[in-house]
Amino acid sequence: MKETIRIIGIDPGLRRTGWGIVESLGNSLHFIGSGTVTSNAEMDLASRLCQLHEGLSKVLHEYMPHEAAVEHTFVNKDATATLKLGQARGIALLAPAQAGLPVAEYAPNAVKKAVIGVGHGEKQQIHMMVKVLMPRASFDTSDAADALAIAICHAHHRQSIASARRLQQLIA
C-alpha cells in the first residue's frame, strides 16, 4: 500500500529562503503550500541566521513534513557572499534535521533535470513546469517556486531510490 509523503523543499538564501511543500503519493504530486522566510539586511549576521531558523522552524511545525530536500549552493566569484550563503544553507539543513526529518541534498542541475528534463534551463522554464506539474501551485517569489522544484525533484528521486531498494531485496 502506498503512503502519502509530505516533502518540504528549501531554497537557501540569506535575504530570502524559499520553501515549498508538496505531497507525493505514487506518481501523483499535490501542492500544499509555499512561501519565503526573510531576514533583515540591517541586522548582524547572527541575528539574520536566527530569523531564518525561527521562520523555517515555524513552517516545519505548521506543515509537519515527513522529509526535506535542500539545494546545494554554487560557488561564485564573491567569496564573502558564498560564505554567507553557505551559512544560510547550514540553517536550511539544521532546521529540518532538528525536527527529526531526513534531509536530502540536490545540485541545481539535478533539480532542473527532474523538473524540466534537462540540467540547464532558465528560471522561467522551471517556474512554468512547476505550474504544469501542479496546476494549483501558487508562489509569490522566485525563491518559493525554486523550493517547490526542489521538493518535486526529491519526490521523483525518492521513488527511484525506493524502487532500487525493492529490486535489491528481490535479488538478495
From Swiss-Prot:
State the superkingdom.
Answer: Bacteria
Calcium is among the record's keywords: no
Q: Where Mg(2+) 2 is bound, by residue?
A: 71
Which residues of the sequence carry a binding annotation for Mg(2+) 1? 11, 143
Q: What are the UniProt keywords, alphabetically?
A: Cytoplasm, DNA damage, DNA recombination, DNA repair, DNA-binding, Endonuclease, Hydrolase, Magnesium, Metal-binding, Nuclease
Needed cofactors = Mg(2+)
Cofactor details (free text): Binds 2 Mg(2+) ion per subunit.
Q: Where in the cell is it found?
A: Cytoplasm
Under the heading InterPro entries, the entry gives: RNaseH-like_sf (IPR012337), RNaseH_sf (IPR036397), X-over_junc_endoDNase_Mg_BS (IPR020563), X-over_junc_endoDNase_RuvC (IPR002176)
| GO MF annotation: an example | DNA binding
The Gene Ontology biological process terms listed for this entry are: DNA recombination; DNA repair
* Plastid recorded as keyword: no
What does the record give as EC number? 3.1.21.10
Q: Which reaction does it catalyse?
A: Endonucleolytic cleavage at a junction such as a reciprocal single-stranded crossover between two homologous DNA duplexes (Holliday junction)
Q: Which residues form the active site?
A: 11, 71, 143
Group of enzyme by EC: hydrolase
Similarity field: Belongs to the RuvC family.
- Job description of the protein: The RuvA-RuvB-RuvC complex processes Holliday junction (HJ) DNA during genetic recombination and DNA repair. Endonuclease that resolves HJ intermediates. Cleaves cruciform DNA by making single-stranded nicks across the HJ at symmetrical positions within the homologous arms, yielding a 5'-phosphate and a 3'-hydroxyl group; requires a central core of homology in the junction. The consensus cleavage sequence is 5'-(A/T)TT(C/G)-3'. Cleavage occurs on the 3'-side of the TT dinucleotide at the point of strand exchange.
How is this protein organized at the quaternary level? Homodimer which binds Holliday junction (HJ) DNA. The HJ becomes 2-fold symmetrical on binding to RuvC with unstacked arms; it has a different conformation from HJ DNA in complex with RuvA. In the full resolvosome a probable DNA-RuvA(4)-RuvB(12)-RuvC(2) complex forms which resolves the HJ.
Question: What is this protein identified as?
Answer: Crossover junction endodeoxyribonuclease RuvC
Which species does the entry assign this protein to?
A: Brucella anthropi (strain ATCC 49188 / DSM 6882 / CCUG 24695 / JCM 21032 / LMG 3331 / NBRC 15819 / NCTC 12168 / Alc 37)
